[in-house]
């Protein structure tokens, strides 16, 4: 008897489930099941966290899109999602803007990650972890035959980015330099600018910078007399604000330099300057925008000794290196890691047939199917006509000599 009731219950569940799929991009053969972990996708974006939930399995479970809400806030319409039926399967989308991330009860936990840079400098980065859940409401009755749905999500960001993700954040470092007459402390800052004049700091639009946009960076020192200069040893980028991120792309290190990077000034004054073209990290391939953080390992050096600390890259400099006097370790300070970012870049889709040669003012010449067929037919007709002409000339050439000999019957009148 129990088996009959179980079979009847399964039949009742499957039939309404197929009917509930009407009007939505669902497949009864694929989505006649209860939700699983794979039915939610979480995208930790530049400006928002986006969650996409398989709506077909929600329908099969007996719920609608209005039954799902962030962190149990079922009475707040701002904490609900919306349906996108233009995908397969249909999904319910939830968006959490980083500027209002705690609006629907999301949890923010700040932690400090210690680390050591490649140069042995002790660093610590504060990271903010945003977590929460999406669930269905509890029934008002004591029991329920519907399963309770629960989806969890989590994203981590540098804390300085969460505090104000509309502006660039830059770190500063204090370097202590010991001299014969005492010790002084200088402050270094890494700033980003729009152009080579270094007058206006970089402003990133909400949609991000186009790829290959040139950005100008400068390391500026304060509280420094004329005997000391700024020397940038190593500048690199990471997809996060953590200078110790395993994923990094070097801009310049010693004599190795990215082709799109230009070192304008280094070791010659109290400011180091360079430029580079922005890019995107491949790990952000599923996102429309990418974050790039810039880091520079910088030190102070005496103005007279900075040339000896610069890398020897050209043959002439190697030849002249033997003439240089030796310098003492006291001629430079310790290194500091400076960071700036995030630089937000966007990936614009470019049509594959959008390239052309010649003057930009001339319209591109494109061949459609009809034009290609006409040109092919004309070429074939021309080749055939030329072949027939050659055959005709060959036949005439063969008959030419025989036509000069006259044959006939002798007329007796002329005898």
UniProtKB/Swiss-Prot annotation:
Glycan-carrying positions: 121, 164
Chain positions of site Cleavage: 319-320
InterPro entries recorded: ZP-C, ZP-C_dom, ZP-N, ZP_dom
Tissue specificity field: Detected in placenta, kidney, lung, pancreas and at very low level in other tissues.
Biased composition (Polar residues): 325-336, 350-359
Annotated protein name in UniProt: Zona pellucida-like domain-containing protein 1
A Pfam family reported for this protein in Swiss-Prot or TrEMBL: ZP-N
Function in brief: Glycoprotein which is a component of the gelatinous extracellular matrix in the cupulae of the vestibular organ.
UniProt topological domain (Extracellular) ranges: 20-372
Residue span of region Disordered: 323-360
Entry comment on modification after translation: Proteolytically cleaved before the transmembrane segment to yield the secreted form found in the extracellular matrix of the cupula.
Segments on the Cytoplasmic side according to the record's topology features: 394-415
Segments crossing the lipid bilayer: 373-393
GO biological process: vestibular reflex
Superkingdom: Eukaryota
Disulfide pairings: 44-155, 79-104, 235-296, 255-313
Domain (ZP) ranges: 43-320
Cellular component per GO, a single term: cytoplasmic vesicle membrane
Signal peptide: 1-19
Keywords: Cytoplasmic vesicle, Disulfide bond, Extracellular matrix, Glycoprotein, Membrane, Secreted, Signal, Transmembrane, Transmembrane helix
């Amino acid at each position: 008897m129990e088996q009959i009731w179980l079979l009847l219950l399964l039949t009742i569940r499957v039939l309404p489930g197929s009917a509930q799929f009407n009007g939505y991009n669902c497949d009864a053969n694929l989505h006649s099941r209860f939700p699983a972990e794979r039915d939610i996708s979480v995208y930790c974006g530049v400006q928002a966290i986006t969650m996409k939930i398989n709506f077909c399995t929600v329908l099969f479970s007996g719920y609608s899109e209005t039954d799902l809400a962030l962190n149990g806030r079922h009475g707040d319409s701002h904490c609900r999602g919306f349906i996108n039926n233009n995908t397969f399967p249909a999904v319910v989308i939830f968006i959490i803007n980083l500027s209002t991330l705690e609006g629907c009860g999301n949890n923010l936990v700040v932690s400090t990650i210690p680390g050591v840079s490649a140069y042995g400098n002790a660093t610590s980065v504060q990271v903010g972890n945003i977590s929460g859940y999406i669930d269905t409401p509890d029934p008002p009755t004591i029991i329920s035959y519907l399963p309770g749905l629960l989806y969890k999500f989590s994203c981590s960001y540098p804390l300085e980015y969460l505090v104000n993700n509309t502006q660039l954040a830059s770190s500063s470092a204090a370097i202590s330099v010991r001299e014969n007459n005492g010790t002084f402390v200088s402050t270094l800052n890494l700033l980003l600018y729009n152009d080579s004049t270094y007058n206006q700091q970089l402003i990133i639009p909400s949609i991000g910078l186009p790829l290959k946009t040139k950005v100008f960076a400068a390391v500026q020192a304060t509280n420094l007399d004329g005997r000391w200069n700024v020397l940038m040893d190593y500048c690199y980028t990471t997809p996060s604000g953590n200078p110790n991120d395993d994923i990094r792309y070097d801009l310049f290190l010693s004599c190795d330099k990215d082709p799109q990077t230009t070192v304008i000034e280094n070791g010659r004054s109290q400011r180091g300057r360079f430029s580079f073209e922005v890019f995107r990290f491949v790990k952000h391939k599923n996102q429309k925008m990418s974050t790039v953080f810039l880091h520079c390992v910088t030190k102070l050096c005496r103005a007279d000794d900075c040339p000896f600390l610069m890398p020897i890259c050209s043959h002439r400099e190697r030849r002249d290196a033997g003439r240089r006097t030796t310098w003492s370790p006291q001629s430079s300070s310790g290194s500091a890691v400076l960071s700036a970012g995030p630089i937000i870049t966007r990936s614009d889709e470019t049509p594959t047939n959008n390239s052309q040669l010649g003057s930009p003012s001339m319209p591109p010449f494109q061949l459609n199917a009809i034009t290609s067929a006409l040109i092919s037919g004309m070429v074939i007709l021309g080749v055939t006509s030329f072949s027939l002409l050659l055959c005709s000339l060959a036949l005439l050439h063969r008959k030419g000599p025989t036509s000069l000999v006259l044959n006939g019957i002798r007329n007796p009148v002329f005898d």
